[in-house]
UniProtKB/Swiss-Prot annotation:
GO terms for molecular function: 2 iron, 2 sulfur cluster binding; disulfide oxidoreductase activity; metal ion binding. The keyword Metal-binding applies. InterPro entries: Glutaredoxin (IPR002109), GRX_PICOT-like (IPR033658), Monothiol_GRX (IPR014434), Monothiol_GRX-rel (IPR004480), Thioredoxin-like_sf (IPR036249). Belongs to the glutaredoxin family. Monothiol subfamily. This is Probable monothiol glutaredoxin GrlA. The gene is grlA. Residues 1-89 form the Glutaredoxin domain. The keyword Transcription regulation does not apply. [2Fe-2S] cluster binds at C13. It comes from Legionella pneumophila subsp. pneumophila (strain Philadelphia 1 / ATCC 33152 / DSM 7513).
Amino acid sequence: MLYMKGTPKMPQCGFSARAVQCIEACGVDFAYVDILANPDIRQVLPQFSDWPTFPQLYVKGELIGGSDIIAEMFQQGELEPMLRDAVAA
């Protein structure tokens, strides 16, 4: 689940756009929540996750991180197997 600003087709910030690019390049379907359309989630999720910024990627209920971590994992070849494993589960 990607909590992001905007939608995958219309990201509303560069960080969300970069996260979507990396995830889509892995070739897996993913769910997302547009936090701009859900102000309650936008306010509460950073307190819950102890992660102050968006996007936030969760896999199997666990926070993976934001845009920088997603991009780093993608570049190191770690993101795709993790996402494929989650989709297969």
